[in-house]
Design a protein with these regions (language model features):
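Terminal, non-globular segments
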Residues: 5, 15, 62-63, 256-264
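Gly/Ala-rich beta-loop-alpha elbow adjacent to hydrolase catalytic centers
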Residues: 107-116, 132
Length: 264
């Protein structure tokens, strides 16, 4: 595993390049695209396990943080969707250069699925894996707001119901579970999820148990939808240190991206 710092025009990204074992490189590479904010923390262990398994199966794997998130440069208020797409394109281009592979795949969870889909079009990616992709930006923002308010309620206890001034102080919509959520980012989340989806890769795998997700993606050439849920509430801090690794997803992704059958 090689840590990387990618700096272009002061927009610094932190990445980890996982390489396949000697003699097992398949000629394939995959970039893992994080979800938004707190959800990226929830998904960290899942991405780590998945990255190691994919590398062991022969793929070059890149995990990275968007500018304004994780260990990359910038403040969290610097994050927005279009910037994250550009970061993904830059990270994937660097992975192609370092690995020398021709076949590139992208994988993303929730908002990361939308980012992966948008970046795949610019990269002419071979394959795309979308894990519980979002459908509606306004609905997603309401869910984030509800989760944020629930966390405040839990943190402040009886004071939350009793003290109107406390609720008013925390009533802004510029934060979600400890991460900045700027008006620009909110607007972009709504706008990009309103755009109709279209064919972009030779093969697209969608994992979600939401029938509306299957309806949105299922009629597109090259798309295969599997009704499979993570079983994880990505927007809560409950059991934050628990093992949030959906085992069925690991096997389905390995089967989709591995050049040969995966072995446990």
């Amino acid at each position: 595993m090689t840590p990387l710092r990618l700096d272009e025009g002061g927009r610094e990204l932190f990445a980890l390049h996982l390489t396949p074992p000697l003699g097992r490189a398949s000629g394939d590479a995959v970039v893992l695209c994080n979800p938004f904010g707190h959800e990226a923390i929830r998904a960290q262990r899942f991405y780590r396990v998945l990255g190691y398994r994919l590398a062991a199966a022969g793929l070059h794997v890149l995990r990275f943080d968007y500018h304004g998130s994780g260990d990359s440069g910038g403040e969290d208020a610097d994050f927005d969707v279009h910037g994250a797409v550009a970061d993904t394109v830059r990270a994937a281009t660097e992975l192609r250069r370092r690995s020398g592979v021709a076949r590139l795949s992208l994988l993303g969870l929730r908002l990361g699925a939308q980012i992966a889909y948008m970046a795949a079009q610019a990269l002419a990616a071979e394959r795309l894996v979308l894990l519980e992709p979002l459908l509606d930006g306004e609905l997603y923002l309401r869910q984030l707001e509800a989760a944020h308010q629930a966390e405040l309620d839990m943190a402040f206890g009886p004071r939350w119901a009793r003290e109107a001034a406390l609720r008013a102080f925390n009533a802004g919509r510029d934060e979600a579970l400890g991460f900045a959520l700027t008006p620009r980012c909110r607007e972009q989340m709504i706008a990009v999820l309103r755009e109709p989806v279209r064919a972009c890769c030779r093969s697209v795998l969608v994992l979600s148990d939401d029938a509306a997700v299957a309806a949105r993606w299922g009629g597109i050439d090259g798309v295969r939808c599997i009704a499979s849920a993570s079983g994880v509430d990505w927007t809560t801090s409950d059991s934050l240190n628990a093992t949030l690794v959906p085992p069925a997803w690991i096997e389905l992704v390995l089967r989709e991206l591995s050049p040969e059958p995966a072995h446990a």
